Amino acid sequence: MAATGEALTPQGYIQHHLTNLHVGEGFWTWHIDSLFFSVGLGVLFLWIFRSVGKKATSGVPGKLQCFIEMIVEFVDNSVKESFHGRNALIAPLALTIFVWVFMMNFMDMLPVDWLPWLASLAGVPYLKVVPTTDVNITFSLAIGVFVLIIYYSIKVKGVSGFVKELTLQPFNHKAMIPVNLLLETVTLIAKPISLALRLFGNLYAGELIFILIALMYGTNLLLSSLGVTLQLGWLIFHILVITLQAFIFMMLTIVYLSMAHEDH
């Protein structure tokens, strides 16, 4: 339902749920809802982990502390297995990426109409609540990782070592420098693009399926009953999807940064 209260066609309903609340035009468009939920969930993550860390005890831990410790241990083991350099930033970065991306993905588990309906009561016409269904958010995360890849590649190998890596691999001959540069540049640029589009594509598709299922509730009793079954089944399966996508984003970040620390 739109903020005006007018009924929407199926096409209009889908378009409404896939439209961001935004200001500005063209390149300078700001997606207010994506920024609000991504920053808000990031602050929530920091607050929860900081609170648990301050109250952590060596005695019998509470349920929340046990859960947080399990996540931290899981991420720490993943870093130890995949990162072969020495860098105190990698484990905290991996933890932040995994939990933050998971929390943004988890917003997809909320019924598609709840928060947009509440927003419409306040006169807000559009509201997308899943930040990772916005390609701008996923590319922002991926570009942040890409900057770290370039930074540590130059820091560990030096400018000359980084240039040699781009120009003398995989074919170690001066005549092949243009070919090497082309191949390595494409490989380097493909890293953030694949990170961003993989996360965006999976979450966008998942959100679209939830929206299509929600359309079934406005038809007849038979389709509405089928919609309940489909939504429950997709909800259960989607828990795996959102967790797996957060894990993949984290692991690829660890692997890419590990490669940046390898001095050939």
UniProtKB/Swiss-Prot annotation:
According to the UniProt record, which cysteines are disulfide-bonded?
Answer: none
Q: How does it sit in the membrane?
A: Multi-pass membrane protein
Q: Which UniProt keywords apply?
A: ATP synthesis, Cell inner membrane, Cell membrane, CF(0), Hydrogen ion transport, Ion transport, Membrane, Transmembrane, Transmembrane helix, Transport
Which SUPFAM superfamilies did the record assign?
F1F0 ATP synthase subunit A
User: Main site of residence?
Assistant: membrane
> Membrane spanning segments where?
29-49, 87-107, 134-154, 177-197, 208-228, 235-255
Question: Could you name the domain of life of the organism this protein comes from?
Answer: Bacteria
Per UniProt, subunit arrangement is:
F-type ATPases have 2 components, CF(1) - the catalytic core - and CF(0) - the membrane proton channel. CF(1) has five subunits: alpha(3), beta(3), gamma(1), delta(1), epsilon(1). CF(0) has three main subunits: a(1), b(2) and c(9-12). The alpha and beta chains form an alternating ring which encloses part of the gamma chain. CF(1) is attached to CF(0) by a central stalk formed by the gamma and epsilon chains, while a peripheral stalk is formed by the delta and b chains.
Spell out the family assignment given in the record's similarity comment. Belongs to the ATPase A chain family.
Q: Which NCBIfam families match?
A: ATP_synt_6_or_A, PRK05815.1-1
Q: What is this protein called?
A: ATP synthase subunit a
Protein's organism: Shewanella sp. (strain MR-4)
